Amino acid sequence: MISCGARLAVFDIAELREVTAYDELELDTLGDRKTALFLIMSDTDDSFNFLISMCYTQLFNLLCEKADDVYGGRLPVHVRCLIDEAANIGQIPRLEKLVATIRSREISACLVLQAQSQLKAIYKDNADTIIGNMDTSIFLGGKEPTTLKELAAVLGKETIDTYNTGESRGRETSHSLNYQKLGKELMSQDELAVMDGGKCILQLRGVRPFLSDKYDITKHRSEERRVGKVCRSRWSPYH
């Protein structure tokens, strides 16, 4: 009882009780039509971060039930969850099972982390299961040793040709030439740590990892429309 009381003590705050007293998000409707829902939390105070985790838990459960009971197993509109700073919202219960089952219901989850070790710190042994159930992973850069080590292993090795020449001098001069093939890491840990900031490494299921340029978001059509509106709103014939 003491442990339960300590965990629920946060609901002694009247404002929090008011926020959670009624369902105003209608999470079960997200797969019915195109909708954007933003869950924003403080990046300096994690006291209420568990609310985000609760929302995702309810979201996955409600949408899976609706997909099965109403739409025959697949939602009419794909629901994509972009979970930025996923390590800061706490643990989403049964995430290792959810990431493997929600995809068939037209639901996907994109976990954004600073380092792979963050996921292991929260989900322990289940972290590898979560990573293994992700069809796509992208490395944007970083220096965390565990991430670099595992990525270097995934990239594999390339074959290089080496030639060694030797010369000995004495009464008679002799020369030697040795040729052999060696395996070299495609990108070593130190190379990954200093990777160009404009590059990324993308891994797709069934495809070998490849190096690619990061997308310039300023060239996206929605960004061009936004900038155009800002420019028009600031224009004045008297300038």
Which residue ranges define each predicted feature?
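Short, glycine/acidic-enriched loop or turn micro-motifs at the edges of active sites
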Residues: 87-88, 117, 232
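H-loop/switch region of ABC-family ATPase nucleotide-binding domains
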Residues: 113
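P-loop NTPase motor core of the ASCE superfamily
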Residues: 28, 34-35, 97-100, 118-226
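Positively charged, low-complexity/disordered segments
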Residues: 224, 228-239
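P-loop NTPase motor domains
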Residues: 1-107, 122, 190-214, 220, ...
